[in-house]
């Protein structure tokens, strides 16, 4: 018997972090919700990260996903921008980990290849394929569409690729260890 799995995809960014929630039952995907969490660019970095943390925590608490997928950071010529993206990505990894949820990470080109069939697909192609795969999806910003694409990628690869458990606290040690152990046990079923 196949059960529904709620998958939260996160596209990290300091200005806008996209999120998308789908349900996967076997190979059948259903759209649940999506949006963006924003931070105020006029605030100091620490307060912007707090805004992202609070926003993602609300999403995780409200929608109670079973698994989370986050896009990996790519390095570009602007080291400062890459570092800021790294900060936002750390928040995107931390929030579900604190909630005891398993987190998978996917490279941007794998997301593009999975969703559009081309590892170098343009954003418009990704959005069109997300809309094709999830006809009820309503997204106003590319960040939300990208997050849905990340969730779709996880749904496609979760059975073939073991979740990276290096970030999980060993059962019996550290805060949230019982929740993490329970989440990992659910994956092993």
Curated annotation (Swiss-Prot):
GO cellular component terms listed in the entry, alphabetical order: cytoplasm; Holliday junction resolvase complex
GO biological process: DNA recombination; DNA repair
Catalysed conversion reaction: Endonucleolytic cleavage at a junction such as a reciprocal single-stranded crossover between two homologous DNA duplexes (Holliday junction)
Coiled coil stretches, renumbered: none
Active site as annotated: 11, 71, 143
Needed co-factor(s): Mg(2+)
Gene Ontology molecular-function annotations: crossover junction DNA endonuclease activity; DNA binding; magnesium ion binding
Subcellular location: Cytoplasm
EC number: 3.1.21.10
Key words of the record: Cytoplasm, DNA damage, DNA recombination, DNA repair, DNA-binding, Endonuclease, Hydrolase, Magnesium, Metal-binding, Nuclease
List of residues binding Mg(2+) 2: 71
Superkingdom, taxonomy of origin: Bacteria
Residues at which Mg(2+) 1 binds: 11, 143
Functional note: The RuvA-RuvB-RuvC complex processes Holliday junction (HJ) DNA during genetic recombination and DNA repair. Endonuclease that resolves HJ intermediates. Cleaves cruciform DNA by making single-stranded nicks across the HJ at symmetrical positions within the homologous arms, yielding a 5'-phosphate and a 3'-hydroxyl group; requires a central core of homology in the junction. The consensus cleavage sequence is 5'-(A/T)TT(C/G)-3'. Cleavage occurs on the 3'-side of the TT dinucleotide at the point of strand exchange.
Subunit structure: Homodimer which binds Holliday junction (HJ) DNA. The HJ becomes 2-fold symmetrical on binding to RuvC with unstacked arms; it has a different conformation from HJ DNA in complex with RuvA. In the full resolvosome a probable DNA-RuvA(4)-RuvB(12)-RuvC(2) complex forms which resolves the HJ.
Family assignment from sequence similarity: Belongs to the RuvC family.
NCBIfam families in the record: ruvC (TIGR00228)
Protein's name in the database: Crossover junction endodeoxyribonuclease RuvC
């Amino acid at each position: 018997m196949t059960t529904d799995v709620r998958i939260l995809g996160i596209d990290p960014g300091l200005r806008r972090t996209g999120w998308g929630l789908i349900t996967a039952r076997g190979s059948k995907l259903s759209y649940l919700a999506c949006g963006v969490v924003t931070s105020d660019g006029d605030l100091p970095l620490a307060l912007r990260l707090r805004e992202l943390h609070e926003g993602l925590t609300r999403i995780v608490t409200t929608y109670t996903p079973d698994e989370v997928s986050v896009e990996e950071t790519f390095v570009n010529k602007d080291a400062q921008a890459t570092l800021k993206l790294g900060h936002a990505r750390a928040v995107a990894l931390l929030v579900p980990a604190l909630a005891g949820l398993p987190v998978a990470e996917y490279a941007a080109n794998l997301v593009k290849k999975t969703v559009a069939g081309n590892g170098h697909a343009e954003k418009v192609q990704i959005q069109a394929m997300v809309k094709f795969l999830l006809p009820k999806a309503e997204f106003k910003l590319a960040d939300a569409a990208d997050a849905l694409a990340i969730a779709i990628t996880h749904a496609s690869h979760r059975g073939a690729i073991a979740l990276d458990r290096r970030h999980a606290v060993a059962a019996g040690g550290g805060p949230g260890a019982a929740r993490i152990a329970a989440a990992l046990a659910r994956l092993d079923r």
